[in-house]
């Protein structure tokens, strides 16, 4: 886990500073179409972070693309940004979907990535992508996104169960908007303001507890000793403690939880010739 934290910190800095690591050989690209953010991750063949880019987005809702053109334009813009930074053309990519969505929605997500100029060579479910970065062989991964919470259970390195529930960061935003009587946009900014976290978290805590109760229901019947939480909506200091108390199972969250899944998608992509 220590190595994972270092890799995620490095990847986060690359995005924050808009810079790239030196590399040799071929590159792998992952595209994560999230409800709140679109992230592109680029790694070398050995899965070391090389570059990344992210954009706030509202083009996906509960794992369904609701603005195809907007999604395609955002991915195309991020792709061009990274190509300029790297000095190469990124031709192939993997992408990911929430567990259990219908084939038509899977195809739509792939079409967005292809419409932005990539050849899609792999589609993986989001919690499984995260599990590869966390190097988990046994346990459960819970990916708390903007619109959905995805669950994958692993045994001996194999995924034995996946599920997805339409609850996530958007529901936290709605609770804040209702509590304070403010517009959704203002509530979203408030939710992300780290200086206000001590005021915000007690209000959205019941949403986190509800998420845990949903996960607990899915985990019943399976032997799970540890739950690993990722995803942008889990980025509160007290999230994992609250989740663990409601779930009754040891809960672990790494740093830069928003970036775990995008990096895992890239790890599960084939390599472009650089």
Locate the predicted segments by residue.
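Nucleotide/phosphate-binding catalytic cleft detector across ATP-hydrolyzing
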Residues: 1-35, 39-144, 158-274
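A structural feature that tracks compact, well-ordered secondary-structure segments
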Residues: 150-152
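A cytosolic small-molecule/anion-sensing beta-strand core signal
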Residues: 155
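Short glycine-rich anion-binding loops that position phosphate/pyrophosphate groups of nucleotides
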Residues: 147
